[in-house]
C-alpha cells in the first residue's frame, strides 16, 4: 500500500491509519475538496484501505478516482443497513462524478399519503421531505389512475385541505360538504369520524398500494360478516360494495406467478458501445404484476453488470416503503470482487423481520419472470436509442443535409475529412487532414504529415496525395475507424485519382465516398464520373465544402511554414562549427529562436549544452559582431 500512497498528502496517510472498524460511509475528496466518490462499508478501515493496495485490481474509472483523491471523510453508522441508506442519500445529494449515474424518476407521479391529521391521499409529482409517505413512482400513469379510482371507490377519505386540528373540530369551525352527503367522506371535520377510525382506513389504503389486495379483501369480508351479525346491514352493504370494487380492480391485474408470492424482480440490459443501460423492476404482489418501473443508467462503459445491478437494487430499497418476501435478479452482484450483498441483506432483514432471499434464478417460473423483465429493459434501451436518433437528426445542420442531398448520399455526412498538400517550390512538402463533425471543426482530430516520398525540390502533388491517403486510411483499416462519412480532396481529377488509387490499395475505398473540389471553378469531381458536378455558388452544400477545403489548406500551409521557419532557425545555428542538428534542436527548444540563443550568456548556454559548446557559441557570436579592422592608408 505504501507505493500507492507515495504521492498522497500526509493527512490522508494518517487518516487511513486511524480509520475505525465500524460500518459507515466514506467520501473521497480531490484537491478542491469536491466529492469524487461515495461508498459504504461494513468495516470502514478495511474497505477504504483496499483502494490503496498495490495488488488490488480496479477498473479504469476507480483507478482515476484514486489518483485524484487527496482526502477522505467518513460517517460512522450503527449498522451496515444504515450505511446503505446514508450512502444512497449522499449520492443523490452530491452527485459524485465516479459513482454509478442512475437517472432519477422525479418526472414520474407518486401517490402521496400526507403527513397530517386525517391524511389526504392524492397524486403528486413532487416529493417533499415532510414525513409524508410516497408510493411509486408510476411510469404508467394509467395504472396510477386506476389505483386512485380503486381507492376512491373502496374508501371514504377526505379530499379537502382543511386544517383538522382537534381544537378547530371541537369549536365547530367547519360544516359538512357535498362529499359527505354523497357518501364519499365520513366528515371527520365535524367529528363524525374519529382519528383512530380514519387511520385504520389509511392502513387499509397502504395495503392496497402495496399490492396486498387479497389480504385486504379478507379483512373487509370478516368485517362485513361482523356487521351483518350485528344487524348493521347498511354498513355491511357498504363493505360488500368495497369488496366488489377491490375484486374488480384485482381482476385487472395479470397473474405472473402461480405461488401468489410477493416478490420484486430486477433486470438489467446494458449497451456499453452507446454508454447506456436500463434497469427494470417488476413489482409482483400476491402473484400479480402491480407495477413496473425503470431507470436509465449512464457512464456504464467501465462498470460491470454486477456493480450496476447492486447499485440499482440498493438505490431502490434505500427509499422503499414496502419490502417483498423474495428478490429476483438478472445478474449476481457477488460476481464483482470488491462488493457483496451483506448491507442489502441486512436492510431487508431489518424491515421484514426475517431473512429475505436474493436469488438469480436459472430455470423455471422465476427465471421466466427475470427474462421477461430483461426483455423489457432491452426494449427501454431500444426506445431510448430511437429517441436519441431523432434528437440527433433534429440537430443536423442544414448545410450537412444539403450536402448529402447534393451528392445523392444515403445519409447526411456528419463526419467529413478534408485533405490538402502544401510545399514551397517542391521543398518541405507536407499534408494535412482536418475533420468536421456536424459542420464544425473538430480540431482535436486534426493531423499533419511530413511527406517522405517526394524528391526535395521536385513538386509532385499526386505522389504526396497518395502517401497521405495511404498513411491515414491504412491506420483506420487496422484500427477499424473512426470512419468519415465523406472525404474531400483539395484538387481536381488528378489528386482525386491518386487518392482513389491508395484507398483501393489499403482496402478503404468502399467504406465512404470521396470527392475532389477543384479551386478554379469550384467543380466537384466524383470517382468514375467524366464530368464534374457544379453546385450553386450560394448553396449551403458548396459553402460547407469550401469551408472544409479552405481549413485543410490553411492547416497544411501553417504546418509547412512552421517547418520552414524551424529549418531556417536551425540553419543559422548549424553555421557554428561543432554545433550539429541535435544540439541546434536542443538550443531552439530551450531558447525559442537563434536570436535568443545569441542573447544568452555563457552560463545559461552551458546549462543546456555544456561549457565547451557554450564557449564555442559565444566565441562565434563575438567574432561575427567584432568591428572590421580600420583600413590603413
UniProtKB/Swiss-Prot annotation:
UniProt function note: The UvrABC repair system catalyzes the recognition and processing of DNA lesions. UvrC both incises the 5' and 3' sides of the lesion. The N-terminal half is responsible for the 3' incision and the C-terminal half is responsible for the 5' incision.
Domain GIY-YIG: 21-100
Boundaries of every UVR domain copy: 214-249
Gene (UniProt): uvrC
PROSITE patterns reported for this sequence: GIY_YIG (PS50164), UVR (PS50151), UVRC (PS50165)
Protein name: UvrABC system protein C
Subunit structure, as described in the record: Interacts with UvrB in an incision complex.
Any Pfam family: UvrC_RNaseH_dom
GO biological process, one term: nucleotide-excision repair
Amino acid at each position: 500500500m505504501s507505493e500507492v500512497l507515495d504521492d498522497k498528502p500526509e493527512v490522508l496517510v494518517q487518516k487511513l491509519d486511524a480509520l475505525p472498524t465500524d460500518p459507515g460511509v466514506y467520501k473521497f475528496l480531490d484537491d478542491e475538496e469536491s466529492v469524487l466518490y461515495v461508498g459504504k462499508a461494513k468495516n470502514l478501515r478495511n474497505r477504504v484501505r483496499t483502494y490503496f493496495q498495490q495488488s488490488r485490481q480496479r477498473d479504469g474509472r476507480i483507478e482515476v478516482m484514486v489518483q485524484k483523491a487527496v482526502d477522505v471523510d467518513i460517517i460512522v453508522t450503527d449498522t451496515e443497513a444504515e450505511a446503505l441508506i446514508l450512502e444512497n442519500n449522499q449520492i443523490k445529494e452530491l452527485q459524485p462524478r465516479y459513482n454509478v449515474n442512475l437517472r432519477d424518476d422525479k418526472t414520474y407521479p407518486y401517490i402521496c399519503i400526507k403527513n397530517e391529521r386525517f391524511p389526504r391521499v392524492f397524486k403528486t409529482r413532487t416529493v417533499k421531505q415532510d414525513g409524508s409517505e410516497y408510493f411509486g413512482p408510476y411510469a404508467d400513469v394509467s395504472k396510477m389512475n386506476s389505483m386512485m379510482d380503486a381507492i376512491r371507490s373502496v374508501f371514504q377519505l377526505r379530499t379537502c385541505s382543511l386544517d383538522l386540528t382537534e381544537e378547530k373540530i371541537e369549536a365547530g369551525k367547519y360544516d359538512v360538504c357535498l362529499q359527505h352527503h354523497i357518501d364519499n367522506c365520513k366528515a371527520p371535520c365535524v367529528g363524525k369520524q374519529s382519528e383512530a377510525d380514519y387511520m385504520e382506513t389509511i392502513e387499509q389504503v397502504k395495503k392496497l398500494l402495496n399490492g396486498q389486495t387479497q389480504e385486504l379483501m379478507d379483512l373487509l369480508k370478516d368485517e362485513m360478516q361482523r356487521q351483518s351479525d350485528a344487524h348493521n346491514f347498511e354498513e355491511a352493504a357498504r363493505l360488500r360494495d368495497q369488496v366488489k370494487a377491490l375484486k374488480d380492480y384485482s381482476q385487472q391485474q395479470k397473474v405472473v406467478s402461480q405461488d401468489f408470492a410477493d416478490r420484486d424482480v430486477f433486470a438489467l440490459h446494458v449497451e456499453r458501445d452507446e454508454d447506456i443501460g436500463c434497469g427494470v423492476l417488476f413489482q409482483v404482489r400476491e402473484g400479480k404484476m402491480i407495477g413496473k418501473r425503470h431507470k436509465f443508467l449512464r457512464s456504464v462503459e467501465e462498470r460491470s453488470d454486477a456493480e450496476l445491478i447492486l447499485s440499482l437494487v440498493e438505490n431502490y430499497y434505500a427509499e422503499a416503503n414496502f419490502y417483498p418476501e423474495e428478490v429476483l435478479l438478472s445478474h449476481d452482484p457477488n460476481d464483482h470482487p470488491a462488493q457483496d450483498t451483506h448491507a442489502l441483506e441486512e436492510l431487508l432483514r431489518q424491515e421484514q423481520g426475517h431473512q429475505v432471499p436474493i436469488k438469480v434464478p436459472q430455470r423455471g417460473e422465476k427465471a421466466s419472470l427475470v427474462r421477461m423483465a430483461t426483455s423489457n429493459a432491452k426494449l427501454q434501451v431500444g426506445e431510448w436509442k430511437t429517441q436519441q436518433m431523432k434528437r440527433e437528426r433534429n440537430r443536423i445542420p442544414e448545410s450537412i443535409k444539403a450536402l448529402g442531398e447534393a451528392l445523392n448520399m444515403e445519409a447526411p455526412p456528419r463526419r467529413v475529412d478534408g485533405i490538402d498538400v502544401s510545399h514551397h517550390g517542391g521543398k518541405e512538402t507536407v499534408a494535412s487532414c482536418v475533420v468536421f463533425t456536424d459542420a464544425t471543426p473538430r480540431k482535436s482530430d486534426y493531423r499533419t504529415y511530413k511527406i517522405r516520398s517526394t524528391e526535395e525540390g521536385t513538386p509532385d502533388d499526386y505522389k504526396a496525395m497518395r502517401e497521405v491517403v495511404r498513411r491515414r486510411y491504412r491506420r483506420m483499416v487496422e484500427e477499424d475507424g473512426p470512419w468519415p462519412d465523406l472525404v474531400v480532396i483539395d484538387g481536381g481529377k488528378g489528386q482525386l485519382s491518386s487518392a482513389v488509387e491508395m484507398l483501393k490499395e489499403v482496402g478503404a475505398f468502399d467504406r465512404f465516398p470521396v470527392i475532389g473540389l477543384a479551386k478554379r471553378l469550384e467543380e466537384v469531381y466524383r470517382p468514375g464520373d467524366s464530368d464534374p458536378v457544379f453546385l450553386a455558388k450560394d448553396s449551403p452544400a458548396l459553402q460547407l465544402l469550401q469551408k472544409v477545403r479552405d481549413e485543410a489548406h490553411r492547416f497544411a500551409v501553417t504546418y509547412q511554414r512552421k517547418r520552414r521557419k524551424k529549418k531556417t532557425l536551425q540553419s543559422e545555428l548549424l553555421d557554428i562549427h561543432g554545433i550539429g542538428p541535435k544540439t541546434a534542436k536542443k538550443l531552439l527548444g530551450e531558447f525559442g529562436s537563434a536570436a535568443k540563443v545569441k542573447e544568452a550568456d555563457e552560463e545559461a548556454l552551458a546549462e543546456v549544452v555544456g561549457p565547451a559548446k557554450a564557449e564555442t557559441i559565444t566565441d562565434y557570436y563575438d567574432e561575427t559582431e567584432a568591428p572590421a579592422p580600420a583600413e590603413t592608408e
